[in-house]
């Protein structure tokens, strides 16, 4: 049952990642429409051969996924709006919150350390 609970907790993060990747793929395909093939000197590179082979293998799956998700009507502006709202709600004050938490943790740890330390070693030297 514990494994199922962990899977359910990870599901929203996984869905967000899949959604972001699908939107990025859709935006990139729109940006590359109408471009020609790479120049001949790039075609001969081994890395470009690997890239082209991966593209051959993955392009049908990406196209099918994009077609299936098309009914959602997601666009770049929709994703940007969602990400901006998420940032405003959860991440805007992350720096100050983290700094405060670290200072409180440090103070708490020092207090625990002093309480465990023998009086002879940790006595205030006033």
UniProtKB/Swiss-Prot annotation:
Q: Which domain of life is it from?
A: Eukaryota
Q: List the cysteine pairs that form cystine.
A: none
Q: Which residues form the signal peptide?
A: 1-27
Q: Name one GO cellular component term.
A: high-density lipoprotein particle
Keywords assigned by UniProt, alphabetized: Lipid transport, Secreted, Signal, Transport
Q: Where in the cell is it found?
A: Secreted
A GO biological process this protein is involved in?
Answer: triglyceride homeostasis
Q: Where is it mostly found?
A: secreted
- Which segments of the protein form a coiled coil according to its record? none
Biological role: May participate in lipoprotein metabolism.
Instruction: Please give the family membership noted in the entry.
Output: Belongs to the apolipoprotein C4 family.
UniProt name for this protein? Apolipoprotein C-IV
Species annotation: Aotus nancymaae (Ma's night monkey)
Give the organism's phylogenetic lineage.
Eukaryota, Metazoa, Chordata, Craniata, Vertebrata
């Amino acid at each position: 049952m514990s494994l199922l609970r962990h899977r359910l907790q990870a599901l929203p993060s996984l869905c967000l990642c899949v959604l972001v990747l699908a939107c990025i793929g859709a935006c990139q395909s729109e940006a590359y429409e109408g471009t020609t093939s790479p120049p001949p000197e790039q075609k001969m590179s081994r890395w470009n051969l690997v890239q082209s082979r991966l593209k051959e293998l993955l392009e049908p799956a990406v196209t099918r996924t994009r077609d299936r998700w098309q009914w959602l009507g997601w666009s770049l502006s929709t994703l940007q709006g969602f990400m901006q709202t998420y940032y405003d709600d959860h991440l805007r004050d992350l720096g100050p919150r983290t700094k405060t938490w670290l200072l409180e943790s440090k103070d708490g740890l020092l207090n625990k350390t002093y309480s465990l330390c023998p009086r002879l070693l940790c006595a205030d030297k006033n």
